[in-house]
Amino acid sequence: MHLSPQEKDKLLIFSAALLAERRLSRGLKLNYPETVAFLSFQVLEGARDGKSVSQLMSEGTTWLSKSQVMEGIPEMVDEVQIEAVFPDGTKLVTIHNPIN
């Protein structure tokens, strides 16, 4: 199987996001890489599902709360940017202050 660098990145994000989801379901708080992977995966899947950039930017602030991440993470993750493939092409999605 031959994968492009972008496809490899998406698989890595998926693996880390899956781990993050499992840890959340066990009541554990997410660290920095898990938090970024979780948010990035939500954007990638939302784009795949046909959501718009503005929808994802708005919804992105509701996916995680401060109680779900380790202390200091909300301050470290003040913005998440990820390129996602939409029906009309690749676009950069930026979520400002994603953890409330």
From Swiss-Prot:
The keyword Hydrolase appears for this protein: yes
Subunit and interaction comment: Heterotrimer of UreA (gamma), UreB (beta) and UreC (alpha) subunits. Three heterotrimers associate to form the active enzyme.
Disulfide bonds: none
Localization: Cytoplasm
Catalytic activity as recorded in UniProt: urea + 2 H2O + H(+) = hydrogencarbonate + 2 NH4(+)
Native species: Prochlorococcus marinus (strain MIT 9301)
Pathway info: Nitrogen metabolism; urea degradation; CO(2) and NH(3) from urea (urease route): step 1/1
Chain coiled-coil ranges: none
Gene Ontology CC terms: cytoplasm
CDD domains: Urease_gamma
Protein name: Urease subunit gamma
Organismal lineage: Bacteria, Bacillati, Cyanobacteriota, Cyanophyceae, Synechococcales
GO biological process, one term: urea catabolic process
Gene3D superfamilies hit by this protein: Urease, gamma-like subunit
Protein family according to the UniProt entry: Belongs to the urease gamma subunit family.
Keywords from the UniProt entry: Cytoplasm, Hydrolase
UniProt-listed Enzyme Commission number(s): 3.5.1.5
Entry's Gene Ontology molecular function annotations: nickel cation binding; urease activity
